[in-house]
Amino acid sequence: MSKIGKELLVGFVPVLLVFLVFLGFNVFPLVLSGVILFSLVYVMRMRGGMGGVTSSERKGKSKPPEYMTFDDIGGQDRAKNELKEALDFLIRHDEITKFGIRPLKGILLTGPPGTGKTLMAKASAHYTNSVFVSASGSEFVEMYVGVGASRVRDLFKEARSRAAKEGKESAVLFIDEIDVIGGKREGGQHREYDQTLNQLLTEMDGIHTSASPRLLIIAATNRKEMLDSALVRPGRFDRHIEVDLPDKKGREHILRIHSKNKPLSGEVSLDQLAGETFGFSGAQLESVMNEGAIYAMRDQAEQIGQGHLS
């Protein structure tokens, strides 16, 4: 229904009710029926039925990620090497078939916030020449029973359909904050997101590694200890990769990446700055460079000096 049609209907209904009351009709049953009908239609539309907008469509179509490679991610050499080794199982399909190796279904990235887990998932899609589909765990949590499970099915279906449409042999499905839906299940207590987790487990068990397009699940969390044991067992998330805070060499690498588009003066020592930022994550180091540029602009300086960054 168009916007004008809805406005006309909203204006017409009260006038009709007033007219019926004026004629002496009892409009209470009519109003009650209308409220019940509206409630049913609203619930069905929220669950994607009756031609309503589906949950995945309300969230918006997944967009291709920006160009991202492992070289664009500063530091994390150990984590990147572990991830590349796992991704080779997706690329070298003929070799792993020859040796009877069971390909991976899932990779779990763990570590503190801001260490580049999402960036590594995007780089994985580029490394394997795969379609990239992403979602956050919070998108699956709803007050309506069954909505989360439906969204899980839609997500897997979208990954496969997009890979087929774009002519790709594989798809990388990234779920951030998986602890929201993958938390430990408590006996006796039934929660809506228990159904969502059960559906995720069912979909992962249904991944046939010989099928095309092949599907790889990458999930990220900073609370690994909260995850249900059924989710992290072998055969589902086979590889657990720790993405930890960068060391000094990694911090300097990250600072160099984020300083490429900034006019640094010759006095700036990124090595010194890397030593001063012990315990900083990649996101915090990016913020340091950004704040330094803001201070330089505030001082109306031509370049960013060491004092703006320290």
Label every PLM stretch briefly.
Residues T277-H308:
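AAA+ ATPase "lid" subdomain C-terminal helix
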Residues G60-A274, G279-F280, G292:
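Walker A/P-loop NTP-binding motif of AAA+ ATPase domains
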Residues M1-E57:
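N-terminal accessory segments that target, anchor, or regulate ATP-driven/P-loop NTPase machines
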Residues V31-G34, R47, L90, A163, ...:
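Hydrophobic residues in alpha-helical segments
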Residues L23-F25, G75, G167-K168, Q300:
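Glycine-centered secondary-structure boundary/capping sites
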